[in-house]
Structure formats: structure tokens, C-alpha cells
């Protein structure tokens, strides 16, 4: 690998600098990290692998990201920079059903599930990855505030409903099967999880405390 892939700047590990060559470098590293996590998991991911598959020199990787933890954390940061918005079906149960089915879609296909599964595994082995995963989902839960706001306006949920607690409750039965009992998940289970969460919401189970 040539030194041409090094960048002259010296930002802190994982620092975001938009545009041009830096953006391309960051995307290339992200893609290599995702590929490595999918193929080898966090324990098998190496700086050498990322360098070989991204075309970015090891010196640059260490200087900008500080090591593997920084690269994995930044890949999660980039995942949170998307334009995803929660569904708007016209009802709380419909919105939660769609959210639950997104979880099913993310983890029921082997190819699609490899990266998110590896991110979760990495969070058990790296505090920095765990912090990044927490931040990713906290931001996702924040976007789901609109689901609850619409439900409150329609009279489907109490005004003090905690959106994050509600979304966790919808996802929890699905993720239990994916990561703990290793059972399959499907649309029927997603719909069941949504219906249960709606019933609990109406009973005030997710009131902010």
C-alpha cells in the first residue's frame, strides 16, 4: 500500500470533516469495518484488514481513529447520519407494527443482519463501541418522539408516554429471540409485539417517571 492514501491533517480519532477526500476516506474505512465485522466479527477484525480493504494507510487509520475501537465507533456514528424517519400510518399500532417489522427485516436475513449483529457483539467487547451503540439508539429513539406525539394528539396514548420506553418494549421480544434464545422472528411476531405495546401504552405502562 502506498503512502498516497495518507492525509496531511491530524484530527482527533474519528473526527468528522465533511466533503471531498476526507469524506471518501471515512466512507471507505466504514465499508471495510462493516465487511470485516460481517466476515470475522469484532475479535477477528484487525487494522491490517481495514487498511487492505479500504486502501487507507495504517498510519492514517491510527492517526485519525486511534485504532479499531475508534473505527467501529465511527462506523456507528455514520449509520446514525442517515435520513431514516419513523413510519406514519395514521395509528399508533400501525406505526409500531411497521417499526417491529423493520427489526424483523434487519435480523431475519443473514446478509442484512451480519453488520448489526456484529455491532452488538462488538459492544460487549469494547466500551467505546458500546457507547457508540447507545448513542445510535438514543438518537433513533429521539426520532420516534413524533410517533408518540401523533398518538397523543389522536387520543391513543397518555400525554406522558416515554417514546424510548415504548420503542424498547416493541423491539424487546424480537431481540430476545434474535440474540438470546436464537429463535426465528417473523411478521406475525412483530405484529404481536406491537399489539402488546399498544395495550401497555393505554394502561400507562410507559409513563415518564
Residues covered by each model-derived region:
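Basic, helix-initiating cap at the start of DNA-binding domains
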Residues: 1-53, 59, 70
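Hydrophobic/aromatic-rich alpha-helical bundle segments in the mid-to-C-terminal region
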Residues: 2-3, 130, 134, 138-141, ...
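Solvent-exposed, amphipathic alpha-helical segments
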Residues: 28, 32-40, 95, 102, ...
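Amphipathic alpha-helical interaction segments
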Residues: 28, 70, 94, 98, ...
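Short amphipathic alpha-helical segment with a characteristic S/N-K-E followed by hydrophobic residues
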Residues: 29, 44, 67-72, 82-83, ...
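Amphipathic alpha-helical segments used for helix-helix packing
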Residues: 70, 75-76, 108-134
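Hydrophobic alpha-helical connector segments
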Residues: 84-113, 166
Amino acid at each position: 500500500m502506498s503512502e498516497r492514501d495518507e492525509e496531511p491533517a491530524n484530527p482527533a480519532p474519528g473526527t468528522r470533516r465533511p466533503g471531498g477526500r476526507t469524506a471518501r476516506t471515512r466512507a471507505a474505512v466504514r465499508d471495510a469495518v462493516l465487511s470485516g465485522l460481517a466476515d470475522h466479527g469484532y475479535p477477528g477484525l484487525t487494522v491490517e484488514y481495514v487498511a487492505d480493504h479500504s486502501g487507507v494507510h495504517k498510519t492514517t487509520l491510527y492517526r485519525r481513529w486511534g485504532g479499531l475501537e475508534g473505527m467501529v465507533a465511527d462506523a456507528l456514528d455514520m449509520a446514525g447520519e442517515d435520513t431514516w424517519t419513523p413510519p406514519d400510518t395514521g395509528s399508533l399500532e400501525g406505526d409500531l407494527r411497521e417499526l417491529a417489522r423493520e427489526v424483523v427485516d434487519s435480523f431475519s436475513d443473514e446478509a442484512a443482519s451480519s453488520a448489526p449483529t456484529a455491532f452488538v457483539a462488538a459492544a460487549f467487547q469494547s466500551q467505546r463501541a458500546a457507547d457508540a451503540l447507545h448513542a445510535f439508539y438514543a438518537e433513533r429513539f429521539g426520532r420516534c418522539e413524533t410517533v408518540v406525539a401523533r398518538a397523543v394528539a389522536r387520543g391513543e396514548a397518555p400525554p406522558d408516554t416515554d417514546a424510548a420506553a415504548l420503542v424498547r418494549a416493541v423491539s424487546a421480544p424480537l431481540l430476545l429471540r434474535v440474540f438470546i434464545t436464537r429463535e426465528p422472528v417473523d411478521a406475525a411476531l412483530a405484529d404481536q409485539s406491537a399489539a402488546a405495546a399498544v395495550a401497555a401504552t393505554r394502561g400507562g405502562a410507559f409513563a415518564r417517571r
